[in-house]
């Protein structure tokens, strides 16, 4: 039987390569066929990014841009260790994209930028706004991020003349989002877990990860599970300790944030942080924000009355609860500290949030 032996390395868009075949495999006399690769990433399952030019692309956005519109097959963007300063957006038409650091640890590959809500756009069309400030914005279903850091390093101290200091590191506005072994770090509004619209689904599963911030730094209307992760409380720009972990904006009848098997900690003052407050985005009274912290370890920074009001909306009118938390920041059931019953807790498990979706690395 004749053999056809292609070149062992993957073709990049553009180059040509030779394939040698045994004579018995050919009907014509020639023994070398020449092939050209297609442009873009139609046939690719993995695209490589490296700052030094050793990959197919030198920026993450260039790799994302190479994925064809309408893509539904999984495409892994493998990113070599290094710090990549720039914005990354995965638009709605490019489903099932994975951003994956190829280093030994999640701190080795860093995607970072420094826009804030009040940062003016270069074209003079206004400011970015909170959602537009994101370093990485994922708007396509099936988005995954793994083994990397996503950061917004906006310098609040240097911009106290700016009125809108919210600075998002990662924004997701999609369904079936899987964040595995990532660090998402910033100050105010670090992690925006959202949906494409008020009526759209937006399931998120975050595990083995770390989220760092100080004010409303896990927020949005997604149905999100944060599991086996570390939530790190960070001091404000002036060195003070005060903040809020979550600000859910859940639609009525939907599930909001479930933090389970995780740790809330940080080098901040005792009794200085709330676990959450209700964000009725745009003053929408029809929303029913929801956050549950369960089976987690709460550090001493957590206030004894861990929930508080926001913009005239009382947390007691929405859905905030705990279940079997431990640590110096935990506390017994009281009017300030609603605890789920065992029966209620049985309906607030990860599987209830994911509703038939089983995230898997791919």
Describe the residue ranges of each PLM region:
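Gram-negative bacterial Sec-dependent N-terminal signal peptides
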Residues: 20-34
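Residues at secondary-structure transition points
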Residues: 13-14, 27-28, 88
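Acidic/proline-rich low-complexity IDRs
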Residues: 10, 25-26, 46, 353
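N-terminal export and membrane-targeting signals
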Residues: 2-24
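Sequence-level preference for short, compositionally simple segments enriched
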Residues: 44-362
């Amino acid at each position: 039987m004749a053999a056809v032996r292609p070149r062992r390395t993957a073709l990049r868009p553009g180059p040509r390569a030779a394939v040698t075949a045994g004579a018995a495999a050919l009907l014509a006399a020639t023994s070398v066929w020449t092939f050209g690769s297609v442009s873009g990433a139609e046939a690719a399952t993995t695209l490589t990014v490296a700052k030094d030019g050793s990959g197919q692309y030198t920026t993450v956005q260039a790799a994302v841009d190479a994925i064809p519109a309408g893509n539904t097959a999984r495409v892994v963007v493998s990113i070599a260790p290094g710090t990549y300063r720039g914005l990354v957006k995965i638009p709605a038409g490019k489903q099932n994209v994975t951003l994956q650091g190829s280093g030994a640890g999640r701190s080795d590959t860093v995607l970072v930028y420094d826009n804030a809500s009040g940062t003016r756009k270069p074209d003079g069309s206004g400011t970015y706004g909170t959602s537009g400030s994101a370093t990485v914005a994922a708007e396509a279903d099936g988005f995954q991020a793994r083994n990397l850091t996503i950061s917004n390093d906006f310098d609040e101290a240097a911009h106290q003349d700016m009125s809108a200091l919210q600075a998002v590191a990662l924004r997701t506005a999609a369904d079936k989002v899987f964040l595995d072994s990532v660090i998402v770090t910033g100050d105010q509004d670090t992690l925006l877990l959202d949906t494409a619209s008020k009526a759209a689904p937006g399931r998120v599963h975050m595990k083995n990860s770390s989220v760092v911030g100080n004010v409303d730094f896990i927020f949005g209307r997604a149905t999100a599970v944060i599991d086996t992760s570390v939530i790190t409380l960070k001091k404000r720009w002036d060195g003070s300790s005060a903040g809020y972990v979550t600000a859910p904006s859940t639609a009525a009848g939907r599930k909001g944030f479930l933090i389970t098997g995780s740790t809330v900690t940080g080098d901040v003052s005792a009794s200085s942080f709330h676990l959450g407050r209700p964000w009725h985005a745009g003053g929408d009274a029809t929303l029913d924000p929801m956050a549950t912290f369960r089976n987690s370890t709460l550090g001493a920074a957590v206030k004894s009355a861990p929930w508080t009001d926001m913009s005239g909306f009382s947390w007691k009118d929405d859905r905030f609860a705990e279940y079997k938390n431990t640590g110096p920041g935990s506390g017994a059931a009281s009017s300030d500290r609603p605890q789920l019953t065992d029966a209620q807790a049985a309906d607030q498990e990860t599987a209830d949030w994911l509703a038939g979706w089983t995230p898997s690395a791919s």
